[in-house]
């Protein structure tokens, strides 16, 4: 690791001001991506501003028929929360599939959504459920928030405060994890929402994306069979040592069928 | 430099450390608690697992500064007065190790797993140990040791 200065922020306001004054400072919450990145010397921030313990970013609650989760909420808290399990069981299920227990004990939902790793799980739920990202400056709809590989609508001084999920009628997530890292080789989140069916795909492309053809097919018939013959184009998908883009395209179709079948059972 | 005060195995330790000091290095180099092993540089192996405020974490992926004020438990605190902790006892009985390098991290991860789920199924044990690697691939006996640990701990609770 290169040298940096560690700063524990006492409030969200203080963290925002610190970021404004130090353009090379980075926020730290759980650190489950950031610290391994620093260990590999892939980043060289001047300061780490620790917001992981801020009470302003804590808490899981149901508000006006929506589920609000504070940005510093750890994955194990979402996975084990009775409120989440009752409101959106697919979200609790997804949180329990992230990384491994040690990662889930420190990693946060805000950190995952801010980082927007193309193989992270939470972006699939945020986009699939049509959630809102509430920041220190504004509210950003999921459809506007995710902008490709590690790219989001956040400006450098903006901090995620909470994620607000509208409750779906039914939802399910199916994931093919990379056997070593636990990251999604392909993960598909399907939700039947008040605005229609939404299908979000993570792990396969350069960033989370909606699969509109599948949404149209599932709108009239929520079943695995409704997806027969449908495929995402392999052309735009990721290819690496772990899988070819054709393999990932097939995984997306298989995971989508599994998620649709899970919803149909509910 | 960061001033940290961390309670480790019940005793408070105040130190002045570089801001980038990892908790694993703090435990090993500052406190001499070398039971916490560092097996990789990539946060994958879980050999460095300790408990921070009651939750299992990889101490190589957390800064000592983040643990300021926290309560940390390492493998050294498991045996008491020369008597093995039930999880250590189970690993011994089931020969849940080959070279033993991953064992401290395994035991601390198992402690975390069994706290959340005192009677895990085999599937749940696999899921609960996903953050720990055994390079000898001695997993069969490790899983046996987890089942035995659960039995011993449940017996103790009764």
Residue ranges and their predicted role:
Chain A
Residues 1-266:
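C-terminal structural segment of proteins
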């Amino acid at each position: 690791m290169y040298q940096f200065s560690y700063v524990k922020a006492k409030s969200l306001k203080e963290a925002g001001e610190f970021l404004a004054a130090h353009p090379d400072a980075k926020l730290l919450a759980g650190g489950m991506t950031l610290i391994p990145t620093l260990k590999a010397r892939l980043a060289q921030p001047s300061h780490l501003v620790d917001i992981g313990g801020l009470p302003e970013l804590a808490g899981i609650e149901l508000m006006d028929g929506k589920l609000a989760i504070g940005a510093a909420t750890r994955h194990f808290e979402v996975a084990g929360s009775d409120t989440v399990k009752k409101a959106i069981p697919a979200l609790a299920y997804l949180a329990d599939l992230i990384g491994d227990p040690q990662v889930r004990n420190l990693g946060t939902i805000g950190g995952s959504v801010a980082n927007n790793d193309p193989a992270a799980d939470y972006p699939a739920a945020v986009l699939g459920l049509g959630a809102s990202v509430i920041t220190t400056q504004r509210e950003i709809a999921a459809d506007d928030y995710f902008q490709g590989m590690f790219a989001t609508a956040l400006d450098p001084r903006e901090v995620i405060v909470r994620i607000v999920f509208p409750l779906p009628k039914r939802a399910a997530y199916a994931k093919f994890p990379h056997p070593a890292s636990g990251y999604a080789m392909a993960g598909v989140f399907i939700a039947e929402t008040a605005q229609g069916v939404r299908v979000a795909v993570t792990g396969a492309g350069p960033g989370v994306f909606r699969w509109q053809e599948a949404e149209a097919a599932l709108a009239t018939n929520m079943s695995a069979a409704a997806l027969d013959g449908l495929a995402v184009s392999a052309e735009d998908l990721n290819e690496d040592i772990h899988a070819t883009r054709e393999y990932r395209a097939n995984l997306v179709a298989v995971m989508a069928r599994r998620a649709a079948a899970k919803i149909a059972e509910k | 430099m960061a001033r940290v005060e961390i309670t480790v195995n019940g005793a408070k330790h105040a130190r002045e450390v570089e801001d980038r000091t990892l908790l694993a290095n703090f435990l090993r180099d500052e406190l001499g608690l070398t039971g916490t092993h560092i097996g990789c540089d990539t946060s994958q192996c879980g050999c460095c697992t300790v408990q921070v405020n009651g939750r299992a974490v990889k101490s190589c992926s957390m800064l000592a500064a983040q643990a300021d004020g926290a309560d940390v438990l390492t493998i050294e605190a498991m045996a008491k007065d020369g008597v093995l902790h039930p999880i250590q006892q189970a690993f011994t009985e089931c020969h849940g190790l080959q070279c033993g390098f991953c064992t401290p991290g395994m035991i601390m991860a198992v402690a975390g797993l069994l706290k959340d789920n005192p009677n895990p199924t085999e599937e749940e044990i696999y899921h609960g140990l996903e953050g720990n690697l055994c390079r000898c691939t001695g997993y069969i006996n490790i899983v046996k040791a987890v089942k035995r640990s659960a039995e011993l701990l449940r017996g103790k609770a009764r």
